[in-house]
C-alpha cells in the first residue's frame, strides 16, 4: 500500500504541475484504503486497490475545502494512476 501511495502521489503532483494547478492548492495527495475493487486490465477483470485523490485549499490550515479541478486534470490523473501504478483498479476524487 505504501508503494502505491507514493507512486500515485507522485503522479498527482506531476499532473498538477503540468496543468498549472500545483501552486494554486494547499495540499494534494493520494490515499490508499483497505478495500479492493474489480476493474479491467487488458481484456480481463482484475481485483485491485482503490486510490482516492485529495486536493484541498486552505487559508490558515484550520479548515479546508476541496479544489474544483477541471475534469481534464482529474481524467489525466486517473488515467495515469490506473495505467502506471501496479495493483490499482479504481481512482476516486474526494469531495470534502
Q: Can you describe what each PLM-predicted range is?
A:
Residues 1-96:
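ATP/NTP-dependent adenylation/nucleotidyl-transfer catalytic domains that generate, transfer
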